[in-house]
């Protein structure tokens, strides 16, 4: 990299975009500082000097949000940033996906991309700035990279598409779409939406791509000015004679028939056996001290299996489990499996199975999101777990990884739109999807299982949601789109395109590809084929349960809503929260109070709610002129008695208003603790209440 600072500027969605190179992080292979509005992101790219053994590309993308970027001090005892939160992890995955396909095939050097948010402007997306920064850091480095790429956020506000919508625009947008690609094609899509049609989604994707092409052209100008010298990478060539011999052996031993074993586990066993048998043919030729030849044979075998799977799909239109390209695996579904859970749904598609379990909580059980933006309260959560046994393996049990966080978030996006608001359903909702068996598309099975669990729990959802994953196999002059891909098709195909939605439209999509990009024609066809598959799955699910149950589980908490005047909130809370804590301690309820005076009372027992409501009504109750109360004498003075009309509200009963007869001393007729009927005669401007017993006698 050049050591001299260079600055390049352009305009992006009405705001200034600046790329600075040559001043910071000069020991990295590539480093850029991206300024977008008041957002500042440092992006660096570093590659190891030597390649790693193995047949995978060791790329790591990190995205770090420094709290000082938003003028905040981290919470917790240590007061410093910890491990990345879920949102940062999702952003790292978002950047990884469009970049990964653009490294040379066979490249095995460790590559680490670090994105550090140094300043955060809520209206200038740090995520999109980091994506451009990652692309630029790679492009101006000596690391082989077939970019640049760019990404944009697309909203849909008042019937118009918007690039990088502001915070206010996002609140009313029907679409939250992130799309990335290079100048020729789109290679990453992620979106949440409120029943967007396939046509609207397609237009949004390519509306975003038009802006991407402009940003890529800007980056190409920067690269042309910097003129980086790329390290030469020469992929390892296969020994053609060895490839030919191994291929002949696979044909003799029936590779096609082995691939077309319909059961996943049996197919895997048969393939392992076939590979082992062929490898033994070369054992005598291998140096006892060197296993490189055997490793090469296995690598060739893996390539040949991939080639055969793709050939069968592209040429013979038959898939490893015998299905046609647009055929869905057998479906099974069930609800109400767990008697003590508030809702449960089991969804099985072929050899993929997800159990989704729903829990209802009070509004106060929300998750607090404290990131670079304002604090947010999340009252709908979807979590996804993928245990080792789901694929017949053993291994350590760890905290959720990037994949589990990503799949959980995708399901959350797909279902968020159908969750009713608090005025209709005053609960916090958490769904956990346990993948019990997996052969591809487990994230979409979790969406289907979650919809079943929502209806089983009696949540009044706006509409059921189903999800499906689409695949792709490309040839030089043709392509085949696959409906409901299984594990082998995901691993050996060119695309994993997940689409979830209702009968009316899309609520979430996610597209990952292993090729350079997709044309408009392919995306349009995949969306339509996904729509047909989604509707077929929906029809099956509705045969199991066609609408939400009328009543909640007997074990679910009960929540009731009451309203008080906003100025009465302080009375319910009390000094330092004393009064509200007394109510909670006495009744055992959970209380959530909104600024408009709405109070949500939650408890497992109706009597607890009723008691809490009575206490709050007493606290917030107001005396009315002309109203008669049976009051209790609390204090006696020379000039009269103070009587309690109801909890928290006293009135003055003047000595002249006690009786029609003249009274010399209040104590002659009243004692502390006595009950007496009084009528409210006046409430002055300070809220002081005057009462009369004499007025009742006069009315007789």
Curated annotation (Swiss-Prot):
The keyword Nucleotidyltransferase applies. GO terms for biological process: mRNA catabolic process; RNA processing. GO terms for cellular component: cytosol. One of its GO terms (molecular function) is polyribonucleotide nucleotidyltransferase activity. It comes from the Bacteria. Its cofactor is Mg(2+). Keywords: Cytoplasm, Magnesium, Metal-binding, Nucleotidyltransferase, RNA-binding, Transferase. Involved in mRNA degradation. Catalyzes the phosphorolysis of single-stranded polyribonucleotides processively in the 3'- to 5'-direction. This is Polyribonucleotide nucleotidyltransferase. It comes from Staphylococcus haemolyticus (strain JCSC1435). The gene is pnp.
């Amino acid at each position: 990299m050049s050591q001299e600072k260079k600055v390049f500027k352009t305009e992006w969605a009405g705001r200034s975009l600046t790329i600075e190179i040559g001043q910071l992080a000069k020991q990295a292979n590539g480093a850029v500082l991206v300024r977008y509005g008041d957002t500042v992101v440092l992006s660096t790219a570093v590659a190891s000097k030597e390649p790693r053994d193995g047949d995978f590309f060791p790329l790591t993308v990190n995205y770090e949000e420094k709290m000082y970027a938003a003028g905040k001090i981290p919470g917790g005892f240590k007061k410093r940033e910890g491990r990345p939160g879920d949102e940062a992890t999702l952003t790292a995955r978002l950047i990884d996906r469009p970049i990964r396909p653009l490294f040379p095939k066979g490249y095995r050097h460790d590559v680490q991309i670090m994105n550090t948010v140094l300043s955060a402007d809520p209206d200038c997306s740090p995520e999109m700035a980091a994506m451009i920064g990652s692309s630029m850091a790679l492009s101006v480095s000596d690391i082989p990279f077939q970019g640049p790429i760019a990404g944009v956020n697309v909203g849909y506000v008042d019937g118009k598409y918007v690039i990088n919508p502001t915070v206010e625009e996002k609140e009313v947008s029907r679409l939250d779409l992130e799309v990335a690609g290079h100048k020729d094609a789109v290679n990453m899509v992620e979106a949440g939406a409120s029943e967007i049609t396939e046509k609207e989604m397609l237009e949004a994707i390519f509306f975003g791509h038009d802006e991407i092409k402009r940003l890529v052209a800007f980056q190409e100008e920067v690269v042309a000015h910097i003129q980086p010298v790329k390290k030469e990478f020469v992929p390892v060539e296969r020994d053609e004679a060895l490839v030919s011999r191994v291929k002949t052996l696979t044909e003799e031993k029936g590779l096609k028939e082995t691939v077309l074993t319909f059961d996943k586990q049996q197919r895997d066993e048969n393939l392992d056996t076939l590979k082992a048998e062929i490898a033994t043919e070369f054992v005598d030729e291998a140096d006892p001290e060197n296993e490189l030849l055997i490793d090469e044979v296995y690598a060739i075998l893996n390539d040949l299996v991939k080639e055969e799977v793709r050939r069968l799909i592209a040429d013979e239109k038959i898939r490893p489990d015998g299905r046609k390209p647009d055929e869905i695996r057998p479906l099974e579904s069930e609800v109400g499996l767990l008697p003590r859970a508030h809702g449960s749904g089991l969804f099985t598609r072929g050899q993929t199975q997800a159990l989704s379990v729903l829990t209802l909580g009070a509004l106060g059980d929300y998750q607090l999101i404290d990131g670079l933006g304002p604090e947010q309260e999340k009252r709908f959560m979807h979590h996804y777990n993928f245990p080792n046994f789901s694929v017949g393996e053993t291994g350590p049990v760890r905290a959720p990884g990037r994949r589990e966080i990503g799949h959980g978030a995708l399901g959350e996006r797909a279902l968020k739109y159908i969750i009713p608001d608090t005025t209709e359903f005053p609960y916090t909702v958490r769904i956990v999807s346990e993948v019990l068996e997996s052969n591809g598309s487990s994230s979409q099975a979790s969406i289907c299982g979650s919809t079943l669990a929502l209806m089983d729990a009696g949540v009044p959802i706006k509409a059921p949601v189903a999800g499906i994953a689409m695949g792709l196999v490309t040839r030089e002059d043709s392509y085949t789109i696959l409906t409901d891909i299984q594990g082998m098709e995901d691993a050996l195909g060119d695309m994993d395109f997940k689409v979830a939605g209702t009968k009316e439209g899309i609520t979430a999509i996610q597209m990952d590809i292993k090729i350079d990009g997709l044309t408009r024609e392919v995306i349009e066809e995949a969306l339509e084929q996904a729509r047909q598959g989604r509707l077929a799955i929906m029809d099956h699910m509705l045969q199991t349960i066609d609408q939400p149950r009328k009543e909640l589980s007997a074990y679910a908490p009960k929540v009731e809503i009451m309203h008080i005047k906003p100025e009465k909130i302080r009375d319910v809370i009390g000094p330092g929260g004393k009064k509200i804590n007394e109510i909670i301690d006495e009744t055992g309820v959970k209380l959530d109070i909104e600024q408009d005076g709405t109070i949500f009372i939650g408890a497992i027992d109706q009597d607890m709610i009723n008691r809490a409501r009575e206490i709050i009504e007493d606290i917030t109750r107001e005396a009315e002129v002309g109203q008669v109360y049976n009051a209790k004498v609390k204090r006696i003075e020379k000039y009269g008695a103070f009587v309690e009309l109801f909890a928290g509200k006293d009135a003055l009963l003047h000595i002249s208003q006690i009786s029609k007869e003249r009274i010399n001393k209040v104590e002659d007729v009243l004692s502390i603790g006595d009950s007496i009927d009084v009528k409210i005669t006046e409430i002055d401007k300070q809220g002081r209440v005057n009462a009369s017993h004499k007025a009742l006698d006069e009315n007789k």
